[in-house]
Structures are given as C-alpha cells and as structure tokens.
Amino acid sequence: MPRRSPADPAAALAPRRTTLPGGLRVVTEFLPAVHSASVGVWVGVGSRDEGATVAGAAHFLEHLLFKSTPTRSAVDIAQAMDAVGGELNAFTAKEHTCYYAHVLGSDLPLAVDLVADVVLNGRCAADDVEVERDVVLEEIAMRDDDPEDALADMFLAALFGDHPVGRPVIGSAQSVSVMTRAQLQSFHLRRYTPERMVVAAAGNVDHDGLVALVREHFGSRLVRGRRPVAPRKGTGRVNGSPRLTLVSRDAEQTHVSLGIRTPGRGWEHRWALSVLHTALGGGLSSRLFQEVRETRGLAYSVYSALDLFADSGALSVYAACLPERFADVMRVTADVLESVARDGITEAECGIAKGSLRGGLVLGLEDSSSRMSRLGRSELNYGKHRSIEHTLRQIEQVTVEEVNAVARHLLSRRYGAAVLGPHGSKRSLPQQLRAMVG
C-alpha cells in the first residue's frame, strides 16, 4: 500500500483512528524508518468473560479458529504466511484476545486477509475441536509442569478466589475436556462483535489503505449482530478474603508468590503504584533483589510483578529457593515489605524507579509489533490513543510522597499467597508467611 506524501510531515506520524459502522475501530501509526508492518485484530474478550462452566473457552477458541476456514485449511494458512517470511499468531489474556501478523509492508494486504479470515470465518469443525482439545490439554499439562507458570495461576486464585480474574486463562483439564463445539461456537458468535474489535497496525502502513482493506475483508460483519453484546463477567467487587494455597510437590526448590489486591488500571495513583513495584522488585537495584539475592544469597530468582485489570489488580512478589532457605527468604521479604509500608522508599529509589519505567517504556517501543500492541491495548482499555509522551509525563509527575502514601495504603492489606514445593502441610510453612496471610 503506497503512502501519499503528506502536506504536514508531523501530522503524518501521528496515530490515526477511524470508527466503521457497527463500532469496529481502525487505528494506525506510520513509522517511516521501518520496512515491516504489524497488524492485529484485538477483541475485547478474555478469560474473565467466561462462565465457570466454560473456563478456558476464549483460549480454546483462539487455537481453534486457526484450524480451518471455508476457503483455507490450517496448512493453507501456514503456507501463505511462510511464503512471505512473516509471522502469524495469537494470544489470549484475562481481558482481551489478539490475532496478529508481522510482515513486510508490501504484504500487508495478505496479512489483513489471513487475520480477518481466521477471526471471522474459523469454522469450529467437529474434527478440529477434538484435535485441538488434545493440543490444549497438552499445553495445560506443560504449564502445570512449570513451577513458575503453575504458581502464577495458583497465586491469582488464592488472591481473587472464585472471581473470574482468579481463574487461569488456559482453563483447567476438567473444563476443557467437557467443552462442546456448540459452546465454543456460541462464544464466538456472541463475543466477537464489531463493537468489541479493534484493528491496529503500525509500521510501513497507510491508514486509508488499511481502512479500505478492513472494509473489504470484514464486509457485512461490520454491522451489529442480532444479539446484544453480552456483558463482561465478574465486574465489581471481589468477594472473600485472600488465602494461602499450598501444592505439595517433590521438587528441588520451593516456589512462593505472595501479594495484595490493588485498584485497577484507571486508578489515579496507577503510576505511583508502578514506581512502588519497580522499587520493590522490578530491577537489579530493587530492595528485594538486593536484600534477598545480592546481600544474603538466599535465592537466584526474586522479583515483583504488577498485573492491572479494568477494575482490580495484583501486586506480587515471587521467589524460588532451596526449601531449607525458605524461612529466611520469607523473613527478609516480610522485613522489606514492612519497612516500605512503614517508612516508604527514598527519593533516590523513587528517581531510579521512574527512570527505569521511562527507559523500559521507550526501549520497548522500538519496532512495529510493540507499537501495534500499544495502539490496540490503548484503544481497548481507554477508548483512545494514549501517546508515549503522555505516559512519560505521568511517570515524571510521580513524587516520592505519593509513592509512600500508596505503600502505606496498600502494603498493610491482607496478603494472598501460593506455595509450591516439598512441604507437607500449611502448618509447616514459615511463620512470617502465615502471619501475612492471616
């Protein structure tokens, strides 16, 4: 798709947005220095939109749609992308699903054709359902065998309980084993509606040309479906208290995740929370990394994580250590968390954390794929584009006083925790951990 020479070069570099009939949005960002183009169809539906009886449906469907369409087999789809040296893939998260392609700019029409065909026309054929069911069950088994992956799911379940955010994106072996073709087809029909979809592209792309391609390949699907958009599952307050979960497993290491519930991504102190997370365990100079690993050598892997959803979130700490060092790791971790809750972080720590966030943000947007992802996520989450400059200003405006107020507010909350390792009972776990969970 050749680009027209713009009268205003600065305007040509600004992201553009078009809303088509039915609510489907097209957002693009032209990057003059690249030859590639990345395009993704972002659907505002994820694992939290599933009922308990179809847990894992969003992820199962994502797999299934690639198996065949009325005009292409799975091999046809793969060969078409391989023939141009591109990448075609998808992923499912708690609140969205994305189908994307990365190609040369000249091959963008093919990429849009393939992605649209998969998203709109995937057949969910009976034979395909059974084959892909086995693939997903293997993926679940592989995830269960990875302590870090398994623990991540265990932790969110311990923190959020029966709330949909607490369920694994991938579902369970039990739910996937009994899921029917009819349930998957219904999920596709009711959830993959144009008002939930964003087509995002970045790189060597022309906005008007992409809009024309979307009109061509989405066609009649651009109008609203006959059924109303199903409401999001699990919005609002999380019921129940965080808890402690233990999976006893014969392993060389003990793996632990513990953390607290936080407000969602729309919280006014969202960036102060990110600074707090970074100062706690987001880098090599963070409190936890320095105290647990560098000073005492108690663990190789120790870090914090921050997961933010529409209406809730989780700030967590992960560590893996020899079982005989578990009590010491928990003692030091508890001391760090209590110290930060009581005394806060220093001005210097705040400055380092802000610099880390700024640098990570900019360095993470050096290619068309990451730019496309930012466009799609921003449109789904906020209904508009949030520029990098806007985010950098938000980070810069964070003060150490705001961070420490957030720490006092959140770190005194009741913790949820998950432990995986060679421990026979919860009573055998370190007292510091049991005290934090309450």
Swiss-Prot record:
Coiled-coil residues are: none
Q: What class of enzyme is it?
A: hydrolase
The GO annotation for biological process reads: proteolysis
Any single Pfam family the record assigns to this protein: Peptidase_M16_C
Named cofactor requirement(s) = Zn(2+)
The EC number(s) given in the record are 3.4.24.-
Q: Which GO terms describe its molecular function?
A: metal ion binding; metalloendopeptidase activity
TM segments? none
Residue positions binding Zn(2+)? 59, 63, 139
**Presence of keyword Hydrolase:** yes
- Source domain of life is Bacteria
Task: Look up keyword Metal-binding and say if it applies.
Answer: yes
Positions annotated as active site in the UniProt record? 62
Record-level GO cellular component terms: plasma membrane
**Which SUPFAM superfamilies does the record associate with it?**
LuxS/MPP-like metallohydrolase
Cofactor annotation remark: Binds 1 zinc ion per subunit.
For this protein, the record's PANTHER family field holds: METALLOPROTEASE, MITOCHONDRIAL-PROCESSING PEPTIDASE SUBUNIT ALPHA
Instruction: Please give the family membership noted in the entry.
Output: Belongs to the peptidase M16 family.
Entry protein name: Uncharacterized zinc protease Rv2782c
The species is Mycobacterium tuberculosis (strain ATCC 25618 / H37Rv)
